[in-house]
């Protein structure tokens, strides 16, 4: 219809699409949509599936047993590790190629990779153990750029945070990505 034609014509006017036919733009859009569907497929099939539990196979622990400390694997890169990589770059990044961008602490920062929240699967036990692991292995500052509205094991996370504080470790916590007033809406581990 005419509305679809208007949309396609406006897309053809975008700088990246100049010179392409509407058919070529349509093909590019199809590829983008397919990529987006593939990217978010795990959320639909795993994150929102209450019966899906990858911990037994991947992590090898009993999530309800907070006394377990030694579990997990060394797969810190994982399928979607871009957030931690991005934050590490802000902290300690060095220029590549023609770029002259440095991280804010590139001369002094050393990065210890501890992936406690893989692919958004934030569990209080994992967060508490990751804090203790990093502190016990010499970390001086912990970036905690994650959070959630519900925290069933928050006591364990708070205890780990107090442990870090006693050891002189600075915790830099996120206030959330949802544009919420954390004075009115709880967001853990921030409040």
Task: Kindly give the residue locations of the regions a language model identified.
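Sec-exported extracytoplasmic/periplasmic mature domains
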Residues: 92-96, 132-140, 162-166, 176
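Acidic side chains
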Residues: 86, 103, 136-137, 181
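Short acidic, glycine-rich surface-loop motifs adjacent to enzyme active sites
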Residues: 5, 9-12, 131-153, 174
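Structural motif
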Residues: 103, 134, 187-190
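Subtilisin-like serine protease catalytic core
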Residues: 1-124
